[in-house]
């Protein structure tokens, strides 16, 4: 829909008329609409309940011989928006950056060298088409700044963009470390002299997760079989984007490997938590408890 060839069909009524005109019999039809947010007007964005496109999609889904797939930019249409619009009749298909196994099947060569390349530039598919390191770095940095960050700022009307930027840097530089909104807020105040509430930090963390830049693993009490509300570990959805954000500095091998393994487990549809076990130790007659 981002191609001007299809500009006419950004009008929801025209789109509906065009698609229905192609459904001429009882055969199965598969409809794929990419960048579907172009069919949503600015006025409709202000009043999501009036988005005409959702009615068009729901109408098509009622047809027994139609299977419809839509994708959209994060800033205009997140997964939860689509699922809400489909009123329980839609399914989410999670597509991750390519795994190391997929990367190696395309890259080939020495496996150790391939892993070093993957640990540096990650698994965004277009990275493989870039001819040299400079092009790869530039692509990932532009993708982070011009696509992901702009999506977040446009969708959520960020009132403190500087805080969002500092928060993102903090998460990227400490992947795999336990943290929470209060801790981050205190760090920003003491190190950067930025006063911000933990509530704002918590809200921004959710924005980063909803926009698929990060995901988090909650702490789970293995013995008590319960989740701790905080702290959690945060991981970048793609390690190449993490490195690009940090200008390819801070190449901490163990943290990067942990992030890659975490992403691999998600790709294999595992639910990943941070296990916590409480241990009681006795020293000089005194009993102490610690978590590990």
Please tell me what each predicted stretch does.
Residues 4-7, 37-42, 77-78:
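Catalytic P-loop NTPase motifs of RecA-like helicase/translocase cores
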Residues 1-27, 51:
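Short glycine-rich substrate-engagement loop in P-loop NTPases that contacts/grips substrate
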Residues 65, 73-75, 79-178:
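Interdomain motor-coupling "hinge/lid" segment immediately C-terminal to the ATP-binding subdomain
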Residues 32, 36-69:
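Conserved Walker B catalytic segment
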Residues 13-15, 45-49, 53, 83-88, ...:
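Short, glycine/charged-enriched secondary-structure capping and boundary segments
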Residues 29-30, 233:
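The start of beta-strands in P-loop NTPase/AAA+ ATPase cores
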Residues 133-291:
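Accessory nucleic acid-recognition modules appended to NTPase machines
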Residues 21-26, 59-66, 85:
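Conserved catalytic network of the ASCE P-loop NTPase/AAA+ motor domain
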């Amino acid at each position: 829909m981002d191609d001007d060839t299809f500009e006419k069909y950004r009008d929801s009524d025209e789109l509906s008329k065009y698609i229905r005109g192609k459904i001429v019999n009882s055969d199965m039809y598969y409809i794929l609409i990419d960048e579907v947010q172009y069919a949503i007007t600015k006025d409709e964005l202000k009043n999501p309940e009036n988005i005409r496109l959702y009615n068009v999609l729901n109408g098509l889904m009622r047809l027994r011989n139609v299977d419809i797939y839509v994708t959209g930019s994060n800033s205009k249409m997140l997964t939860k928006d689509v699922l809400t619009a489909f009123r329980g009749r839609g399914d989410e298909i999670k597509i991750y950056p390519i795994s190391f196994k997929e990367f190696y099947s395309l890259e080939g060569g020495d496996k150790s060298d391939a892993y070093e390349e993957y640990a540096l530039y990650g698994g965004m598919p277009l990275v493989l088409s870039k001819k040299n390191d400079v092009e790869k770095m530039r692509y990932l940095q532009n993708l982070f700044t011009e696509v992901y960050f702009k999506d977040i700022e446009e969708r959520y009307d960020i009132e403190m963009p500087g805080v969002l930027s500092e928060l993102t840097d903090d998460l990227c530089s400490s992947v795999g470390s336990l943290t929470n909104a209060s801790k981050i807020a205190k760090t920003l105040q003491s190190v950067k002299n930025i006063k911000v509430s933990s509530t704002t930090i918590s809200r921004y963390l959710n924005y980063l997760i909803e926009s698929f830049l990060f995901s988090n693993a909650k702490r789970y009490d293995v013995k008590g079989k319960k989740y701790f509300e905080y702290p959690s570990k945060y991981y970048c959805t793609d390690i190449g984007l993490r490195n690009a954000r940090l200008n390819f500095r801070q190449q901490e091998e163990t943290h990067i490997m942990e992030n890659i393994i975490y992403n691999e487990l998600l790709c294999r549809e595992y639910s990943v938590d941070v296990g916590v076990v409480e241990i009681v130790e006795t020293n000089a007659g005194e009993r102490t408890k610690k978590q590990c």
